Amino acid sequence: MRYPNAFDYKVTCEEAIKIVPIPPFIIESFVGNAIKHGLKPGKMTEIQVNVSKLEEFRILIQVKDNGTGFSDDSLDAVEEFLEKGIVSEELGVGICNSVARLRLIYGDKCEIRIYNQELSGAVVDITLNLQKTEAV
């Protein structure tokens, strides 16, 4: 294993949502980002993936950790990319590709927020507004 005893993870998903298709490697890229950039030396990092129903046609996919979080420069780059589509050196390829794929598949029916938790760690919130045929 590449990072032995460096992190632990927990995945929770409401039973009714398990039938909703989620594009491959979307969640994995954000989890990979948490592992690659969020680990604190000598401290166990907790990574959580939660998938929950917000309303009849909306689900929330949340990836969060208690690691180092994003630097201010990285958060600025993320915000600029999410709002204007401008890619900077501070922004990772994985985030760009995942956001681009989500927007390609869901268009304006997808909301993405990337931010730091108050004490430590990063959070990625992906809200999908599903079609009636996809709803849970």
Report each predicted region and the residues it spans:
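Two-component histidine phosphotransfer core
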Residues: 1-115, 119-127, 135
